[in-house]
Amino acid sequence: MKGIAKSPANADYIDALPVNMLATPKEVLNSSGYLRSFPGIDKRDDVAGLSRGVQFNTHESVVYRVLGGKLYRGQSQVGDVSGAGRISMAHSATSQAVAANGVLTLYRYDGTTKTLQNWPSTVGDVTYAQYDIGSVRDVCRLRGRYLWVKDGSQDFGVTDLEDESHPDQYRPFYTAESQPDGILACDTWRDFAVMFGSSTIEYFSLTGSTDTSAAIYVSQPSLMVQKGIAGTRCKCKFGDSHAFISNPSGGAPSVYAISQGSAAPIATASIEKILRSYSASDLSSAVMETLRFDGHELMIIHLPGHVLCYDASASSNGPQWNIMKTGLYDSPHRGIDFMFEGNQITCGDKTEAVTGQLNFSSSAQYGAQQEHLLYTPLFKADNMRVFDFELEASTGVAQIADRLFLSATTDGINFGREQMIEQNSSFAYDRRVLWRRFGHIRKNVGVKVRIITSSPVTLSGCQVRLE
């Protein structure tokens, strides 16, 4: 469900992606699917700052967020977090861990706070080895231990079973030898520790050994993926495995999903054009996350100048992407760190110190109307007259009369004057969205549909009459 246009820069045909609209593959009124506006955002709370990270704590059954310089448990502040950049989170049966500013801090559920540090050098007549913990880049948890990535090295460390604020007493560090430039991120998959580098993704399994001289983790070469990630947040759990943005060191960046030890591309050519427009440093700052509601399985990629959304549930006939934005121009969507909380989907914010919650009865963001764009494919209409351009719309839910703006293109690049059509007003549930006299077409034609509204938008069944 996307249009076709031409690029004025290189004369290539490109996908005209829908903006703020999600495709739903469902039979409706002789159509194979329809497009529905992304839910709006209502304000929830004023908070300490911009959103830096989120995790659902399964032990406490509550969402932990880092907002500005504070850690929030639900809607209550429980601690201070240093720095201002993105953070990594993990949790155990006794603590919520936050890796920020190179330090791993454990916020225990009893109210105390600990940081990852070496055991005391001597306790009575017992001497403990002292290790170089380094700067913590990323953190995850597997079984009874936290795993942290030592920034700038090929090593990752594991905490002790007795006290998770200290490294393992006997064999705390392991090396991803296929990643000479250092591990960028870590995560878990089933019972494996996953180490993401710029050229490979390496898997480590537990050995189960109780011998203090034996390794806790051992590499599994059969699962290694010969692709790397672009940055620490450029991966997320998606489906049964992971999705990631590939590192430019392996060629032009793309988006891949890992399946059975291999990486399968899920990006289209138009998405890859957007990705390669960024420098390696800008691409490394991207953030990936997943979101699920109403049958949509979404993967959201937050880039510095774009927010891209992939819908796995609508991609059976090809990858279905759309663009998410805020306002009437090209500002990236302001919501980030979406999480199902209670019976609401809540989110942080990139631009203001607030949190929000999705409102499925609106498309407004914090009360402001949003722009929605759709494009039809270019179709042949050689020397023909076009009448009765019509869209099926679910109308009648607007508080004020909304207008839909239609404009045509004959070359796929330049769009003409917009035609305004009233498309939504209170209780007019059977209103037709109809442009009766479209005009004479010499060769090809395509249409852009633009709607600025705070009401939900549902469109399908585009059709015209040719003579």
Explain the meaning of each model-derived region:
Residues 54, 106, 116-119, 139, ...:
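Generic beta-strand hydrophobic packing signal
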Residues 1-95, 226-241, 248-467:
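Beta-sheet repeat architectures centered on beta-propellers
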Residues 69, 102-103, 152, 199, ...:
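Residue-level signature of beta-propeller blades and closely related beta-rich strand-turn architectures
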Residues 105-111, 154-167, 201, 308-315, ...:
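Short beta-strand segments and strand-loop junctions that repeat across beta-rich extracellular domains
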Residues 65, 98-99, 148, 195, ...:
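Residue position within the beta-strands of beta-propeller blades
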Residues 89-125:
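Hydrophobic or amphipathic alpha-helical targeting/insertion segments
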Residues 39-50, 76-85, 117-145, 149-287:
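Beta-propeller and closely related beta-pinwheel folds
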Residues 61, 69, 94-95, 102-104, ...:
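Beta-strand-connecting loop/turn residues
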